[in-house]
Amino acid sequence: MGATVGVYFCHCGGIITEKIDPEVVRAAVLRLPEVAYFTPISLLCSEDGLGELTRDILARAPERVVIAACSPREHERTFKRALAGTTVNPYLMQMVNIREQVAWVVDDPAAAAEKAVAGIRSAVRRVARNLPLRNIEIETHEETLVIGAGPAGMQAALTLAVAGRPVVLVEKAPMIGGLPVRYEAVAPNMECGPCMLEPMMDQLLHGDAARHIELLTMAEVTAVKGFLGNFEVTIRQAPRFVDASACIGCSMCADACPARAPHPYNCGFDTRPAIAMPFLGALPNLPYLDPATCLRTTGEDCRLCEQACPVPGTIRLDDREKVIERTVGSVIVATGAGLYDCGVFPQLGHGRVPGVYSSLEFERLSSPSGPTAGQIVAPGDKAPERVAIVHCVGSLDAAHQDYCSGVCCQVAFKFNHLVRHRCPEAHITHFHRELTMPGKEAGRLLAHNLEDERNTFVRYERLDDLRISDAPGARRVEIMGGATVRGGEFDLVLLCPAMTPGADTKAIGAMLDVATDRWGFFEELHTRMSPTSSKVAGIHLAGTCHGPKDIPQSIADGLAASASILASITPGKKMELEPIRASVLEGRCSGCRVCLSVCPYRAISFDEAAQSASISQVICQGCGTCVAACPSGVIAGAHFTSEQIYAEIGGILA
C-alpha cells in the first residue's frame, strides 16, 4: 500500500496544542509510509473547520483518513457526516483521541507528543484494513402494537395516535384502565381513580385520535415474529357475544340473566350474571358474556338476554374467537404488575381468618362500584372500630421480595384516609418495617397520618414475627419477639403486599424474546440511560411491567416509549442502521450454539436444517460478544475484525 492516508490534526482551539506540539507530531507522522500528508486545523468540529476538512479531502483525494482530535464519542458522527460529502467512505476514517487520552492526562510535552504519534500510527495501520461499509436500509411499518391498556399503555397509544400513527391496542380484560379504575381513591391526593383516568379513556375511545387506534379488548397476543420495523403479530380475541357497534349499554341483558358466578372484578365477594358489565363505570360501556357461567354451556337453550335486549341483533350468541394478524414496526409492552400472594404467609390468616383482606380486596370493598357499594364493614356487618394495617407484606425480605415497591406505604395511608372518612371514630394501628414516601406530595400524606391522635404506629423487624389469629368477635394481631408480645384485637386487618411481576410476564417474555431480571420483571436495556427500552430493538417497556412504580411514573413511561418510537421510525422513510454488525462465516459454523446463549440482544437464531447459526443484521447491535465467544472463531464483527484490531495494537507497540 502506498501513501494514501491523509492525517488531520485538530488544535481544539489551543486545548490540544497547549500540550502537544503539532510540528513534532507532523515530522514523525510523515515518516510513516502509508501517510500522504498531514494537515493541522484549528477547530475541526466547527462549521469553518468542517468546511476546510471537506474541501481539503476533495482537493487531495486520499483513499483513507485519520483524524486526531477529541473523543470519538463526541464527534465521530460529526466527521462521518462530513465525509459523506466527499470521495472518502465514512468507514474509511479512523479517529484518535489525543485530547482526553493525551493532552489532558500527560503533563510532559515530549511524552505527550510521543503518545500522540503512537496513537496516530496505530490508527493509520488500522484504517488501512478498514472496509468501505454502507449503512443498512430497511423498510419499516409505522404501526405500533401496545400490549396492555392500563395508564402506561393508554398514554403510549394516545401519544402515538395524536401524532397520526396507527396503533393496535390489545387488552386481555373486557375494559381498559388497568387496576386504578377499580380504586376508590389514588394516593397521595385521594383523587377518584376512575374519575382521574376518565378523560384519557374518553379521548382514547371517542376523541379525535381514536380513529388511529384499533382497540382489541378480551384479546391476547399469541405470537410475535420479526425485527425492528417489521414485526408479524398474531392476536387471539375471545368472543364478547355482544355487538359493540350496536350496544347502548342499558344492562337489560344482565337484569334478565338467571345464571350467577363469583364476580372476578370484585375478588369473588359477590356474584355477577353470566352477561354483565365488568363493574359500574367500566369502559368501554359494554357487557360481556362469560361462557363458563352461561346456562347454554350446560346444554340449556336460554336466550333471556337476547330477548331482553331492546336492540335486536346486539346479543350474538353465535360469536366466535377471532384470530387477528397485523404487521407493526414497534411493540410497547405495558402489561402491568401483580401483587404478592398474601396466602404465602399462613401466620397472617389471609383466606383463613375472616376480616383479613389484601390491598386489592379492600380496594373493591371500599369502592362505590364494589360489593358493599363503598361501605366499610367488618365481619358481622358492623362498622369497624379498630383497624390494623400491615405494611411491607413480602417486601424487604430476602426470602420473598427483597426490594421496596415504593407505593405500598402510600396505599396503606390511603386506606387510613378511607377508613377515617367513613368511620371517623375508628382507631387505626399501622404495623410497619419502614415508612417510604417518595416524591413531592407523599410527605404531606405521611405527616397527616402521624398527626392523627387516633393512629398508632408499631414497628416490627420481620414478617415472620407477626401472628394474626381469630379471636372471639375479632382478629388478634401479635408481634412475637424477645420477651414481650405486642399487639391487640382488631375488627379489620388490611395487608399491603409488594408489587410483583404480572402472572403472564414470563410467557410474554418468552414470546417476545425479551429477558426478565432477577426479580422477574422485564429487563431494561439500561436501567438509567434507556429505562423504557428492552434489549430487543423495537420492543419498548412501559409501566409496572418492568418494575414497581406509581401512576405518574407509569404515564411518563408511556410517553417516553412512544416518543422513542416517533423518533426512530418515520412514515414513508427507510430506517438507516450502522453496518457495524456481526456475521457468521458461511459454511463454517460447528453448530455449538454458544453464541445464542451469550447474545444480549437475542439477535442470533439457529437453523436446524443447516445446523448453523445466523445473525439478524437488523437486531444485532455490534457489541462483539458472540465474536469473542465463538470457539471456532467463525463469527466476524464488521469494522472490528481481528485483523483490524491486531494492526491497531501493532501500531501502538511499534
Where would I find each of the regions flagged by the language model?
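Residues forming the flavin
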Residues: 1-654
